[in-house]
Amino acid sequence: PKDLIEEVFNELARRWVPIFNHYQDNGVDIGFELHPGEDLFDGATWEMFLDKVKGHKAAMINYDPSHFLLQQLDYLAFIDLYYDRINAFHVKDAEFNPNGRQGVYSGYQPWLNRAGRFRSLGDGQVDFKGIFSKLLEYGYNSWAVLEWECCIKSPEQGAAEGAPFIAGHIID
């Protein structure tokens, strides 16, 4: 129906603004992890939401480049646009290898067989040197948290490799 999306974002604002106000009164921000399949999943939906909540200062972004890579969104340009709203960073890798049978939506295949899938840090296609550099350029001084989901390696291997990977990318 006409105006359905507008109605949805108005309802999101109605529900979130009181929460933002309470959190702000207590010195806490909320970092939204923009994710495919959620109400907020890219810059356009973020801007629609931010407009409806009148730019509330407690509304922030938990930046996860793997979600943007799987959507084929320019995750480095995203930082340029929204750096002042990024308050957390999930260091998570992914790869996107489309073929003649599947693309972004991956045809309901198991993770191992999807065109887009999460990988251990350094095994995917995310440019972490570019991300860490760009965040530093904008004065980012907050969390860089390992989030791990890999369809090939074990969680133990992911953790053992992930911590030194992040440490090696942090710029002093």
What are these regions (language model features)?
Residues 1-60:
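Active-site acidic/histidine proton-transfer and metal-coordination neighborhood
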Residues 9, 39, 43-47, 51, ...:
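Gly/Pro-rich active-site loop or hairpin
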Residues 15-30, 130-141, 170:
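A structural motif corresponding to the C-terminal end of an alpha-helix
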Residues 16, 20, 67, 82, ...:
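Tryptophan-centric aromatic hotspots in well-structured domains and transmembrane helices
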Residues 16, 86, 163:
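Short amphipathic alpha-helical/adjacent loop interface patches that line ligand
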Residues 30, 46, 64, 89, ...:
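Conserved, mostly hydrophobic/aromatic
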Residues 33-37, 64-68, 92-94, 147-151:
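Active-site beta-loop-alpha junctions enriched in small/polar residues
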Residues 155-172:
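C-terminal helical cap(s) of enzyme catalytic domains, especially alpha/beta-barrels
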